């Protein structure tokens, strides 16, 4: 039996809505030939399956085993053609590609004038929506046609096309360079996490500024600014400069708020910008502004003119619920947060083919933290085990580390003393494999190791000593992020004061919100 996720045709069919399936069958009906009925039979069979099973297909004798591969490829292609014809999938890029195809067909038939007319309209549409890669492709085809279709205005036309091609090429090279830089920074973040020391910081900073082009930001168009800000956001996250990440993510979102027509043209970038802004607001502990940003994003995505497709639906879920959880951790409303867990687990199942394992595991970690916050340590452990037992998981080392540490603390709180020693051993073995450990992680593990030797009447003082030791790292540039993954200080305060961790965090959030916050300059 082939895994569902590896059988692309099966996954594609399962992703279709009822209307898309209906349209596909109508599309096949218009084709009408006996050979086509085979792939429709295969479509209907796969649509009814809960899991992909090749043997069931062969038992139906739709085709022989040798023919099945070709039939699946043919069906896959026909589904994509049907989807392309669906008005729901007609975004700007698809429309432009369609017009370019039409112009190419007319050119091949020698109908140069008609081809140029279509290209001129398509080019205007591409430039209005900052689709400059497509615009460049259109100009290149215009140049090819003009070289064969001689007119009296050729001289002026040549100068215009050459100027447009040069300008678009320059803009596209800049965007390509900045997108490469962003991708390299993102890869560094996923593989190794955030900078851990001055050496890391110098290495990343040297790389970033060596790669960063010297430009005047005011001279950049919308798309070029977008990539420029994105690269700076990733650099700021990597170097843990949270005010800088707030600054550039704010500029990113403000661009869309100023040019709202770009939201419809580039909805993914709109969502990502808001997500990075909210992550920055979490890092600088600004819950009031965070709520405003989350509410504005939720309102925007429900508007009629916001594009609708499966990719956007999964991203909207990812960014909305991930940030709802972040808000809960900032405010300490853990019991209220439990209400969203059924929604999250249901949507994780619905979007399983759209979300990568890394993001799914982050949800599991945050759900575990929710249960930890309401003293439900057994459920906390259940979700942590989903991460720990996933041996094929490619996840950030720092998150995997705190998953292990939280598991040790949860086992201690749950009273699973018989598991605690094994947990500590496994955690130590895992941490030894890591390149660099934070001092916060070292201190927590040292404390947990000697817990069994501490008498009950000495516990409170031991918690106070650890709290004092960890507090020294709270404002350390490289250590402070550790407290975001695992609010160990609030846990220690709850043990010292005999109060729930939710009470402690809620009290801190109220103090934060009562503080007079001056607007943070982003210029």
Where are these regions (language model features)?
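Alpha-solenoid helical repeat architecture
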Residues: 130-137, 172-179, 219-226, 261-272, ...
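"A position-specific structural signal for the A-helix of alpha-solenoid helical repeats
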Residues: 97, 101-105, 134-137, 141, ...
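Amphipathic alpha-helical segments of tetratricopeptide repeats
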Residues: 120-128, 162-170, 205-217, 250-262, ...
């Amino acid at each position: 039996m082939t895994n569902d996720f590896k059988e692309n045709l099966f996954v594609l069919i399962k992703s279709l809505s009822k209307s898309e399936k209906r349209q596909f069958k109508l599309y096949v009906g218009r084709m009408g030939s006996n050979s086509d009925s085979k792939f429709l039979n295969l479509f209907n069979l796969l649509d009814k399956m809960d899991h992909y099973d090749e043997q069931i297909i062969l038992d139906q004798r739709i085709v022989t085993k040798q023919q099945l591969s070709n039939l699946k490829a043919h069906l896959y292609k026909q589904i994509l053609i049907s989807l392309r014809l669906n008005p729901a999938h007609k975004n700007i890029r698809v429309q432009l590609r369609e017009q370019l195809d039409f112009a190419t067909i007319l050119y091949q038939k020698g109908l140069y004038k008609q081809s140029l007319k279509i290209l001129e309209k398509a080019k205007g549409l591409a430039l209005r929506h900052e689709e400059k890669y497509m615009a460049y492709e259109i100009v290149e085809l215009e140049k090819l046609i003009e070289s064969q279709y001689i007119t009296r205005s050729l001289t002026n036309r040549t100068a215009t096309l050459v100027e447009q091609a040069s300008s678009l090429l320059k803009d596209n090279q800049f965007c390509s360079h900045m997108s490469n830089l962003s991708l390299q920074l993102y890869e560094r973040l996923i593989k190794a996490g955030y900078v851990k020391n001055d050496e890391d910081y110098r290495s990343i900073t040297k790389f970033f500024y060596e790669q960063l082009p010297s430009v005047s930001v005011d001279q950049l168009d919308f798309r070029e600014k977008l990539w420029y800000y994105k690269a700076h956001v990733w650099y700021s996250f990597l170097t843990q400069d949270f005010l800088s990440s707030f600054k550039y993510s704010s500029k990113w979102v403000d661009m869309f708020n100023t040019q709202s027509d770009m939201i419809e043209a580039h909805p993914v970038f709109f969502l990502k910008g808001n997500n990075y802004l909210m992550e920055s607001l979490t890092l600088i502990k600004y819950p009031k502004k965070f709520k405003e940003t989350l509410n504005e994003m939720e309102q925007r995505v429900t508007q009629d003119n916001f594009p609708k497709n499966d990719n956007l639906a999964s991203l909207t879920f990812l960014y909305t619920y991930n940030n709802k959880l972040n808000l809960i951790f900032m405010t300490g409303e853990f019991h209220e947060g439990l209400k969203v867990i059924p929604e999250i687990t249901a949507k994780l199942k619905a979007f399983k083919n759209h979300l990568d394992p890394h993001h799914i595991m982050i949800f599991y970690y945050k759900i575990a933290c929710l249960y930890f916050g309401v003293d439900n340590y057994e459920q906390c452990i259940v979700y942590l085990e989903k991460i720990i037992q996933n041996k094929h998981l490619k996840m950030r080392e720092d998150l995997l580390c705190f998953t292990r540490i939280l598991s040790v603390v949860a086992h201690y709180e749950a009273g699973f003393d018989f598991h605690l020693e094994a947990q500590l051993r496994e955690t130590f073995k895992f941490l030894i494999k890591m390149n660099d450990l934070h001092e916060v992680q070292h201190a927590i593990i040292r404390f947990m190791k000697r817990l069994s030797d501490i008498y009950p009447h000495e516990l409170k003082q031991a918690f106070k000593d650890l709290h004092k030791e960890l507090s020294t790292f709270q404002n350390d540039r490289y250590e402070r992020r550790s407290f975001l993954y695992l609010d160990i200080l609030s846990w220690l305060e709850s043990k010292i004061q005999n109060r729930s961790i939710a009470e402690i965090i809620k009290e801190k959030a109220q103090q934060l919100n009562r503080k007079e916050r001056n607007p943070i300059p982003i210029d």
